[in-house]
Swiss-Prot record:
Family: Belongs to the DapA family.
Assigned keywords, A-Z: Cytoplasm, Lyase, Schiff base
Catalytic residue list: T43, Y105, Y131, K159
Organism: Thermococcus onnurineus (strain NA1)
Subunit record text: Homotetramer.
UniProt gene name: dapAL
Annotated GO CC locations: cytoplasm
Location of this chain's protein in the cell: Cytoplasm
GO MF annotations in UniProt: 2-dehydro-3-deoxy-phosphogluconate aldolase activity; 4-hydroxy-tetrahydrodipicolinate synthase activity
E.C. numbers: 4.-.-.-
GO BP terms in the entry: small molecule metabolic process
Annotated CDD domains: DHDPS-like
Protein name: Uncharacterized DapA-like lyase TON_0506
Amino acid sequence: MRGVIVPLVTPFNEDYSIDVPALEEHIDFLQKAGVHGIFINATTGEFTSLSVEERKFLAEKGRELVNTTFYLVGTASTNTFEVIELTKHAQDLGADYVVIAPPYYCPLNETALFRHYSMVAERTDIPIILYNIPSCANPLSVQLIKRLALEYSNIAGVKETIDSVNHVRDVIIEVKGEREDFMVFTGLDQHFLNTLILGGDGGIMACANFAPEVHLALYKAFQEKRFKDAFIYAQKLARLSKVYDLASSFGSAIKLAMSLRGFSIKPVLRPPYIIDGDEVKEEIRKLLREVLY
């Protein structure tokens, strides 16, 4: 798996129930756009605000709908046994990969983190993509990622949502250097091109929910060695990623941007998250106009 993977938003109705028609419409849009993977129950999908039953429902619904690209399911939790349960569920319904962020809230050392992932890897067969997001969860060091990758063949890759070129470089050199099939994806739109240049496999990036054409154009240009064009698209993504700085949360930023671009997904976040007001919406409108039009 390589290229542009979209961490899907979860559409909600005004009463906070899951908006299934909007989910169906968005998945159809992304598949027609030509993205290389769709990732449900992601951070962007507000998985921490969903019950286990809702996460299973979304995973099942996504499996019904995603039929032209790779299908990834997020199975992270602070409870190791819940991760195993969700991972087995994703495996049984035929997902291609699971994506597992580390436990959050309580600090854990590397021994505990290794045990957490090893318990999941030993009890399931589905390929696992580690998810390093140190701003929200316990960090995964290069050496821990390497140890997991070399000891468990079903630990297939890592998503790096970390604002550090050096860290991503070291993962690519240290881990891919010893296991060529280990995949490295950036989780940050603004790091897409440099991750590819360093030898990474692509990106799992939230702005691709509302502007996948930019990410896809960059990837195509890079693959075809049209590097001047790739630089232009990378500059667009660098500017577009400023959307996160304008809103109180990335969820608010993405859903407001989607509403401004005409998607039917409502600007509704589940509590405790809130959608920002008209002032922020206008700032996002201005940014989108400058970058995309």
